[in-house]
């Protein structure tokens, strides 16, 4: 996350979703603008620390996901944080990446945070059968909650 304020109401939902699947994860405050050395060190050690997917959330001039993607070959998922401009500034900063430096950008806010976790789970499910089974069960349960008729 780019700042501590990104946690409440947004990224806490990402973490809770990852916990539902038993996915071990770290939560850190790292800013592309204010703590670039911290970002470089984190990414330098990421693969050694067995990190397989990075979820980067930031608001306003949200460059965290893009800078992260430029410094690693690990999959980077970007979550734009809602802002005074309803998150549009964050969305555009996250999604508008040059060719060759991909960021998987999700929706603004809580929905994006939850979907970032689910996309990370999906990425990990390619390698880990137990994660795939949990994802299939989640999807099946999710489908059962949708009514067939409106009333």
Predicted regions and their residues:
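Internal, active-site/partner-interface "lid" segment
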Residues: 128-151
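Short, glycine-/small-residue-rich phosphate/pyrophosphate-handling segment
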Residues: 85-133
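N-terminal beta-loop-helix "entrance" segment that forms/cooperates
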Residues: 25-49
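Glycine-rich phosphate-binding loop
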Residues: 42-80
């Amino acid at each position: 996350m780019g700042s501590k304020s990104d946690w409440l109401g947004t990224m806490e939902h990402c973490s809770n979703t990852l916990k539902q699947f038993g996915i071990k994860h770290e939560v850190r405050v790292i800013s592309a603008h204010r703590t670039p050395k911290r970002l470089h060190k984190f990414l330098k050690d990421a693969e050694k620390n067995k990190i397989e997917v990075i979820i980067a959330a930031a608001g306003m001039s949200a460059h965290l996901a893009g800078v992260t993607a430029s410094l690693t070959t690990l999959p980077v998922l970007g979550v734009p944080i809602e802002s005074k401009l309803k998150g549009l500034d964050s969305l555009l900063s996250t999604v508008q990446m040059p060719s060759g430096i991909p960021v998987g950008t999700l929706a603004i806010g809580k929905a994006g945070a939850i979907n970032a976790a689910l996309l990370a789970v999906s990425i990990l499910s390619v390698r880990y059968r137990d994660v795939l089974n949990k994802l299939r069960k989640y999807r099946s349960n999710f489908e059962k909650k949708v009514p067939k008729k409106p009333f």
